[in-house]
């Protein structure tokens, strides 16, 4: 086998540059994302990514909900969070944070979006850790 390849092997800076160059026009309404993998909020759509080994990606082991941001206020967030937490319990997804911290993250992410009217979507996943069938290989759940 030859040591040369026509398929590029990218460095981290090259990969980030390509992610930035590859942002599609529909991403114009991707305002902010909290990533428990990164441990913070990003506002650049190119960085709004999920690890391939996250069980949400290859097993569908996740739950989600959507709240409405209207006039800068999150409408009925507490009932939405309650539903998310019930769904997570049913799906046997442990919480990566206490409820209060999840609530704060949703508020902070909505604020970072700099929008006054938008849909706020959030997911709880079994998390990354491998490509097997069971969640036991996950290193921790993701929000």
Regions from the PLM with identified roles:
Residues 1-143:
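Conserved alpha/beta cores of soluble small-molecule-handling proteins
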